[in-house]
Curated annotation (Swiss-Prot):
Membership in a protein family: Belongs to the DCK/DGK family.
Listed InterPro entries: DCK/DGK, Deoxyribonucleoside_kinase, DNK_dom, P-loop_NTPase
Gene: dguok
Listed PANTHER family: DEOXYGUANOSINE KINASE, MITOCHONDRIAL (PTHR10513:SF8), DEOXYNUCLEOSIDE KINASE (PTHR10513)
Protein's name according to its UniProt entry: Deoxyguanosine kinase, mitochondrial
Active site feature: E129
Enzyme kind, highest EC tier: transferase
GO biological process terms, semicolon-separated: deoxyribonucleoside monophosphate biosynthetic process
Annotated source species: Xenopus laevis
């Protein structure tokens, strides 16, 4: 009888300790326009702060949607659909589908449990490339304002998004945001240079719209935010207009500013 009561108690204590450790983790998202340099910035941080953990945007998932109804055979592979391509080619038809899937994939990333090695560190920092919040306040909001999401779709999106945020609570909460800032013109220049096939049809005007959304949300604080913990979240604005990938001094400056920002959270 004694062993039966001890084991659940030990499990409960272990769970609570794990939960307490996880609550001490500082979670931040890196936000910014398309092609502002988020992936390059994350590589810079990961090379410097190797004890931190980094979660990149699940781009490949959006580019490869596998049919679940396909009957596999030894001589063929399941068909794949590039949802990102579909959305850019026909935004009015595919925006709601894409935003639903992209947001779901972001939720999956943000609620993933931390590994034991991470939990054993003295300082626990987790960095996400974008977040469930920018999915709503930047991209879905922009698509609605461009009339690619209709009134019904926008209402439904906000309804289930709010429900999931409240349901997952602390597991998707952020402690800070790193906002990578560059002009839309510079982002468009970088977009053309990287030549991602899905982005061939993107115009400067779209990047200008996304830039304005970031400014309203993170700088001017005029975006109406539904979640109390996000209304006064600390934001570190980093100007990345100039190249920092091939400039070690610029890279060091960014690293130092991020280190100081994280230490102050």
């Amino acid at each position: 009888m004694k062993s039966q009561t001890t084991k659940p108690l030990q499990q409960s204590i272990s769970t609570n300790l794990s939960s307490n450790k996880e609550m001490q983790v500082k979670r931040l998202s890196v936000e910014g326009n398309i092609a502002v340099g988020k992936s390059t910035f994350l590589r810079l941080l990961s090379n410097t702060f190797q004890e931190w953990s980094f979660a990149t945007e699940p781009l490949k998932k959006w580019q490869n949607i596998q049919s679940t109804s396909f009957q596999t055979t030894t001589s063929s592979k399941p068909p794949m659909d590039n949802l990102l391509q579909l959305m850019y080619d026909d935004p009015k038809r595919w925006s709601y589908t894409f935003q639903t899937f992209s947001c779901m994939s972001r939720f999956k990333i943000q609620i993933q449990p931390l590994s034991e090695p991470v939990l054993k560190q003295q300082e626990h920092v987790q960095i996400f490339e974008r977040s469930v919040y920018s999915d709503r306040y930047i991209f879905a909001k922009t698509l609605y304002e461009l009339q690619h999401l209709n009134e019904m779709e926008w209402t439904l999106y906000q309804e289930w998004h709010t429900f999931l945020i409240q349901e997952f609570s602390r597991r998707v909460a952020l402690d800070g945001i790193i906002y990578l800032w560059a002009t839309p013109e510079k982002c468009f220049e970088r977009l053309q240079r990287r030549a991602r096939k899905e982005e061939k049809t993107l115009q400067l005007q779209y990047l200008e719209k996304l830039h304005d959304q970031h400014e309203s949300w993170l700088t001017k604080k005029t975006t109406e935010v539904s979640f109390e913990n996000m209304k006064n979240i600390p934001v570190l604005l980093l100007n990345v207009e100039e190249d920092f990938e091939n400039n070690s001094a610029a890279g060091d400056e960014l690293n130092n500013r991020v280190k100081a920002f994280v230490a102050g959270l």
